[in-house]
Structure formats: structure tokens, C-alpha cells
């Protein structure tokens, strides 16, 4: 365990094309093997496709998709007297954002379209319309928290 305490949070640099820190976060989530230019090409291509299909600002589409995917509750395992309970807890805003981006990227990778640009664009559009696997994941998370509501008093 480090003795200095937690590392300070570094501020996110705004993305050079859209001027949004959300786009920077998305690029960093797509990033594999340090290939940032490839990740940027994928994200910018997907946002451009989203602009062509909707005719609106792609950053607005991204924000709407994130709002539809962000969980407000999740379950955390808590051990009490030999039994492990799934305790529902509220999700902090930063974690909700991170989870939403992670789910969007993972479910985009699992899609069947030919290129990653198409997959990400379609997942973003589906999520912004309240459809898609990432929105279903959020609903499942909320359902799990709701069904374990009886253990909410074990929160810490």
C-alpha cells in the first residue's frame, strides 16, 4: 500500500476536434496497445457517422447516449457472518461516467458490423435512442440492485 496516499486526479484535456473532455475519455477507453491515433480515428469516424445519420451535433448524441447508459445504483458484495450479500449502493458520478463509457465500448466491440467505426457509431445511436446492449446492461444492474433492496441496510 502506498504511504503517500492516493495519486492526485489529473485534469482531462479537451479533445482537439470537438473540444469535449467526454470525447477524450472515449478515445482513452477505445485505446489498445498505446495506439492513440488509431483510437482517435475510430472515435472521430464513429462521431462523424453519427452526425451523418442524425444530422445533429455528435457530442450531443454522445452525451445523450451516456445519460441513457449511466447507472444510478449498483450492487457490491458485503460479507456478513459467513454469508456474502449483494448490497445495493449509489454510484458516484465519476464512476457512473466511467462505467457507461466502458459498457458502450465493450458492447460496441461485441457487435457484428464490419468495422469498429460502424460498431461504435451504431452502439452510440442505439444508446442515445434508449436501445442497445449497453442500455440493457444498465437496466440489468438496476434490476439487480432493486431485487437486493432488502440488504440495503448493510451499506457502509
From Swiss-Prot:
It comes from the Bacteria. It holds the Pfam family Ribosomal_S7. One of its GO terms (biological process) is translation. GO terms for cellular component: small ribosomal subunit. One of its GO terms (molecular function) is rRNA binding. SUPFAM superfamilies: Ribosomal protein S7 (SSF47973). Keywords: Ribonucleoprotein, Ribosomal protein, RNA-binding, rRNA-binding, tRNA-binding. Belongs to the universal ribosomal protein uS7 family. Part of the 30S ribosomal subunit. Contacts proteins S9 and S11. NCBIfam families: rpsG_bact (TIGR01029). One of the primary rRNA binding proteins, it binds directly to 16S rRNA where it nucleates assembly of the head domain of the 30S subunit. Is located at the subunit interface close to the decoding center, probably blocks exit of the E-site tRNA. This is Small ribosomal subunit protein uS7. The gene is rpsG.
Amino acid at each position: 500500500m502506498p504511504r503517500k496516499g492516493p495519486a492526485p486526479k489529473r485534469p482531462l484535456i479537451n479533445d482537439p476536434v470537438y473540444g469535449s473532455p467526454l470525447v477524450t475519455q472515449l478515445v482513452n477507453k477505445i485505446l489498445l496497445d498505446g495506439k492513440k491515433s488509431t483510437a482517435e480515428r475510430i472515435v472521430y469516424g464513429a462521431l462523424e457517422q453519427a452526425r451523418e445519420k442524425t444530422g445533429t451535433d455528435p457530442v450531443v448524441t454522445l452525451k445523450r447516449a451516456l445519460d441513457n447508459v449511466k447507472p444510478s445504483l449498483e450492487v457490491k458484495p458485503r460479507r456478513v457472518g459467513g454469508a456474502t450479500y449483494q448490497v445495493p449502493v449509489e454510484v458516484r458520478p465519476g464512476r457512473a461516467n466511467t462505467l457507461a463509457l466502458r459498457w458502450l465500448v465493450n458492447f460496441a466491440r461485441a457487435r457484428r458490423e464490419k468495422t469498429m467505426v460502424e460498431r461504435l457509431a451504431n452502439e452510440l445511436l442505439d444508446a442515445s435512442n434508449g436501445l442497445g446492449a449497453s442500455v440493457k446492461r444498465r437496466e440489468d444492474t438496476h434490476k439487480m440492485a432493486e431485487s437486493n433492496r432488502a440488504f440495503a441496510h448493510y451499506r457502509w
